[in-house]
């Protein structure tokens, strides 16, 4: 797998995340200066879930995002391709399943909402992933995608890119069990579509009413949409 490329070997991606599962959550909190907690809350609020809703949290990792979603009273399922990540989150009180985001083990029109946080970028074919998420979502159901994006504050983008390519890998060497994975993280973020381009891709792959909210100056963009009724 070329680190700077969006072409990925799914086995390599799974192996990479298996290796970081144990310290994944605390590492992300350190590297994001605690902003990851805010981003999870914003995702839950955007979905506006109700008790009894069925929700799929795709690329859920250790399930920390699924726990946040479940605070709404909805029934939330954590799905991830990495067994290592799921094992690291096995203490969480949410149902977990090992699943391929391009071939989900669920019937059509199963969920009231589907969400994926910082995982769409890691799918071998993210467009196919968007269509697969639409398949398992009920007509009129909701989508939320939290993903690293392009800063919108003038001058900040340069500082952020410097952090991504220099500071983040250096800090990861101290706090992560697999710092190489954070080099991949930095390079994949740089290669990822910006907010408007990703919105176009979401619309073209099964979703409507697509919009986004920039979080922390656009470091993260929270895209949302709905599945058409027909």
From Swiss-Prot:
Pathway(s) of this molecule: Quinol/quinone metabolism; menaquinone biosynthesis; menaquinol from 1,4-dihydroxy-2-naphthoate: step 2/2
| Enzyme Commission identifier(s) | 2.1.1.163
Provide the binding site for S-adenosyl-L-methionine.
62, 80, 100-101, 117
**GO MF annotation, one:** demethylmenaquinone methyltransferase activity
Keyword list (alphabetical) reads: Menaquinone biosynthesis, Methyltransferase, S-adenosyl-L-methionine, Transferase
Q: Name one GO biological process term.
A: menaquinone biosynthetic process
The top EC class, named as a word, is transferase
Query: What catalytic reaction does the record list?
Result: a 2-demethylmenaquinol + S-adenosyl-L-methionine = a menaquinol + S-adenosyl-L-homocysteine + H(+)
Q: Does the keyword Cell inner membrane apply?
A: no
Give the family from UniProt.
Belongs to the class I-like SAM-binding methyltransferase superfamily. MenG/UbiE family.
Described by its record, this protein's role is as follows:
Methyltransferase required for the conversion of demethylmenaquinol (DMKH2) to menaquinol (MKH2).
Query: What's the name of the protein?
Result: Demethylmenaquinone methyltransferase
Q: Which organism is it from?
A: Corynebacterium urealyticum (strain ATCC 43042 / DSM 7109)
Print the organism lineage.
Bacteria, Bacillati, Actinomycetota, Actinomycetes, Mycobacteriales
